Amino acid sequence: MWSYTVEFFRSLDIPVRTLECCSGDLADLKVKSCDIEAWSPRQQKYFEVGSCSNLGDAQSRRLGIRATGDNKYYPHTLNNTVVAPPRMLIAFLENNYNEDGTINIPMVLRPYMGGKETI
């Protein structure tokens, strides 16, 4: 699932990296978590823009979700925050900003912007 988030940001010309969280940094219920971080030219560092987590069966147990097959069981659940809108907008503007005050429009958005290359 995290690859969809990474591809989304890269399609907007935003440099990203993934970071697997250590067990000491995991929130309640999480078995494994991976953060997606975007580059901030202004701050000269990466900042979190998304997260993907495996919660094991803890969430389904709390919610009483059961799956059936050969036996009834609690399914494992996954969570993926693809876009946190304020963070995505910051990353988009910072990475596509030009010195003259214009913003580059990534190729994937140009058909929706009348073919414009900048705004």
Residue spans of the language-model regions?
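TRNA-recognition modules of translation machinery and tRNA-sensing kinases, especially anticodon-binding
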Residues: 1-119
